[in-house]
């Protein structure tokens, strides 16, 4: 991971710039986090946009794949960008994503993805997969009070 990250938030950008979707999620008032099979850390559901895919569809697909969400309400919050080398960006150039919020009311009984498990937490975790990015996205969502 790089040492320096620059995070910015936007109301909107050109659609073709949006490469990722991240979905801050809650269920029954608890934060929803995923634990990847190959990591000992927790992360917010999210992932890459597929060719020709609407970015909001990316958000819904990633939420379902990574959490097993069956019933949920999801809405876009804002566009974010990260500048700096990360696990998913080796160029260090500014990359853009759609930040969404979801309230999940029902989960599938098992996951069929790279995630080992889904964990519901009262507090935010200490061991983040993306510690310099995802906590700031949640902080921004909390500041906007968009529930």
Per-range role (PLM):
Residues 18-20, 95:
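Short, surface-exposed coil-to-beta transition loops
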Residues 14-16:
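Short loop/turn motifs at secondary-structure junctions and domain boundaries
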Residues 50-73, 80-138:
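Unchanged
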Residues 1-5:
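Short, small-residue-biased leader/transition segments that mark boundaries at the very start
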Residues 21-25:
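Short beta-strand scaffold segments in enzyme catalytic cores
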Residues 26-65:
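Conserved Nudix-box catalytic region and its N-terminal flanking loop in Nudix hydrolases
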Residues 9-12:
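Long, compositionally biased, intrinsically disordered
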